[in-house]
């Protein structure tokens, strides 16, 4: 590791999904270990950096939070370039956000590198009393059939 880079590995994460599924909250929780229940719509993209130590290696993660609105899709397409991991997020209390995952996966397949890792995230599990999408639905509908690496809630 050179003193200029200050990391051994660089990973680019891209968070995608419908507007309102909690992508920005995931980013804030991961990068800064904070939570905000105020919904602020992302315009274009947001970006955070977090450096981790994994088995004595410094891993720098660049995490890109994309806007979920249709009008920003042309802007966010360029952010797929060089992505190591794409996190597809849906809201477990919003069936429509789950049903739109197929469209998001098509975007990933068209725009991301062939070797990108895909992670499916069912968000807002703290609101499980309002659940519209079961864990098994995610597993059967997307995880088992679309070559995803991880499914988590």
Say what each PLM segment does.
Residues 1-153:
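TRAFAC-class small GTPase G-domain
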């Amino acid at each position: 590791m050179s003193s200029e880079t200050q990391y051994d590995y660089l990973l680019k994460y891209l968070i995608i999904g419908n507007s309102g599924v909690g992508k920005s909250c995931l980013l804030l929780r991961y990068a800064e270990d904070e939570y905000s229940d105020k919904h602020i719509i992302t315009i274009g993209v947001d970006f955070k950096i977090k450096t981790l130590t994994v088995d004595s290696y410094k891993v720098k993660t660049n995490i890109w939070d994309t806007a979920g609105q249709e009008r920003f899709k042309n802007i966010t397409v360029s952010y797929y370039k060089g992505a190591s991991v794409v996190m597809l997020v849906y809201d477990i209390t919003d069936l429509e956000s789950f049903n739109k995952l197929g469209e998001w996966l098509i975007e990933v397949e068209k725009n991301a590198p062939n070797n990108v890792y895909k992670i499916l995230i069912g968000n807002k599990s703290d609101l499980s009393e309002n659940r519209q999408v079961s864990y098994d639905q995610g597993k059967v509908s997307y995880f088992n059939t679309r070559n995803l690496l991880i499914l988590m809630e």
